[in-house]
């Protein structure tokens, strides 16, 4: 009888131990998921930061303006640099869309960011000029279908930015008075 009671108690303690262990494993998995989510968001934001910094640390800004104002005067080397820059931008958009598709969206202050909205807002900057649109048309075959759909819709509804109109649009959005000529 004594061994039967002892056996029952040991079995009960073992069962409780297993339940506690399972609870700890579930907690650890949840914690690891949150860490993975935070790391994914960090990687995404670092990618956008690298793109933004590259515009100021290299001659990309000058080339980008030249690609809008006088795309016919771009050299082969300049076309290569701009193409590499736009490829990085597009890869970053594809990473951002993939993260959102897998539930790894980014929110701040209760505001959920939509990659589609962000892409639509930045189309004039990256793809508003003749060079940007041409680059997109030549490279759309490897771009995610969801992004192609947004770009096609938005580009069809917007005029091609050229020369001063591009800079005037930016100035008007910033509230800067146009310069009299």
Stretches with model-predicted labels:
Residues 13-25:
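Hydrophobic membrane-insertion alpha-helices, especially the h-region
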Residues 1, 17-19, 30, 169:
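N-terminal functional modules and adjacent low-complexity/disordered segments of proteins
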Residues 1-14:
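N-terminal positive-inside, membrane-proximal cytosolic segments immediately preceding the first
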Residues 1-2, 22, 72:
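Generic secretory/membrane-interface signal
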